[in-house]
Each structure stands twice: as C-alpha cells, then as structure tokens.
C-alpha cells in the first residue's frame, strides 16, 4: 500500500518550486536560485529516511531538501528575499542555505567542497560515539574532483557512516558528459573500494525508500 503523504509531498515540492520560479522570472530575488525540478523523488525519499541523529550536507542546488526539512515555503522565500524573517535571517540566501535545527548542517556553492565537510562530520560522529548517518548530495561534475575520490577513500578507511548521493543529469552547464569526458564507472569504483553502490534511475520515491 502506497503512503498517500509521500505523493502529497512530491506535489507540494514541485508546486513550491514553480511558485519560486514565477517570482524569480519577475526579477523579485536579487540572488541566484537553482531549482531542482525533476529531483523531487530522491529528496522526498531521503527526507523520510532521516532520523534525529542523521544530517544532510548539500550543494548549491538545495531548495528541495531545505523545503522538505523546513516544511514551509514562506520562511525559505523570505530567505531568498534576504529578510530577517528568513530561515537564516537573510544571511545565507540560496546557494549556501543551511538549517542545523532541521538536520541541514551545511550547503556549499563550491564544486565538490561539501564532500570533505560531510566526511569530517561523519568522522566527528564516530569520534563522539554518535550513531547518526551523514547524507551528502553531490553531482556528476563534482565526481571529477579530487575531493570526491579522497572522501570515498577516507570514509572507507575509517568505516564512517556516510552516504553519498550523486545526482547525475548527464549535463555540465550546456555540455553533455559524452561530449566532454570519458564516462566514470561509479559501480566499478565502488567495487574497487568494497563500498556499497546502488543505481537509482526512476522517479519512484517508494523504490528509494524501500
């Protein structure tokens, strides 16, 4: 039996982004905002899997995760307006928006920067005997960076509770991956380090949750 609330969250998340986009097109925001249309399913699944001691480390494209964790469009939009009534009192805007009270520890607008931060958070959990899992979201561009490979190796070497989610739309700005570089076989990379790897290729959040 499907949980109706999962579907409701998917629809709500899409509508929130559409509303933000309409205001963005009118030039109401003075900061760049990266929408996540089409990325809703994974975000809903992660949101519903997170426990109290778990945490999220995000990229510049964090609107979907922050909306779900906050459960409110108003405070996030106020943050985009850089108002004091925003999630972070108008100080973080969009690309660096974090909300530690809702398990969002850090967001970074620098390519690959959040990976070593997340790895450090996972190490901190281990050293302080916290059983939480750190979920870090990255993209297909960041997996080309040394920070990605080093974070994988460090996390495995130290048995850290770290889950890396790679959102891959096979585009880097205006160029397809096939035009720009050789393919990176993440399944083989994970196997070489004896790391669990799962490829999720549908928009079915129930598949991700289970």
Task: Describe the residue ranges of each PLM region.
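Positively charged, low-complexity intrinsically disordered leader regions
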Residues: 1-11
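Short, surface-exposed alpha-helical recognition segments that flank or form part
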Residues: 8, 112, 203
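Thiamine diphosphate
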Residues: 158, 162, 166-210
């Amino acid at each position: 039996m499907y949980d109706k609330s999962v579907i409701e969250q998917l629809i709500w998340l899409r509508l929130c982004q559409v509303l933000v986009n309409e205001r963005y097109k009118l030039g109401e925001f003075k900061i760049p905002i990266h929408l996540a249309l089409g990325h809703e399913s994974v975000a809903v699944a992660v949101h519903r899997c997170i426990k109290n001691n778990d945490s999220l480390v995000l990229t510049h494209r964090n609107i979907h995760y922050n909306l779900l964790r906050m459960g409110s469009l108003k405070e996030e939009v106020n943050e985009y307006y850089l108002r004091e009534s925003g999630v972070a009192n108008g100080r973080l805007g969009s690309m660096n928006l974090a909300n530690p009270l809702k398990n969002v520890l850090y967001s970074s607008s620098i390519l690959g920067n959040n990976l070593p931060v997340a790895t450090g958070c996972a190490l901190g959990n281990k050293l302080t005997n916290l059983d939480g899992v750190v979920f870090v979201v990255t993209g297909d561009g960041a997996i080309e960076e040394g920070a990605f490979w080093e974070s994988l190796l460090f996390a495995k070497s130290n048995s850290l509770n770290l889950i890396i989610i790679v959102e891959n739309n096979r585009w880097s700005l205006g160029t397809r991956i096939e035009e720009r570089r050789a393919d990176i076989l993440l399944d083989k990379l994970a196997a070489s380090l004896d790391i669990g790897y799962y490829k999720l290729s549908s928009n079915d959040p129930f598949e991700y949750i289970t």
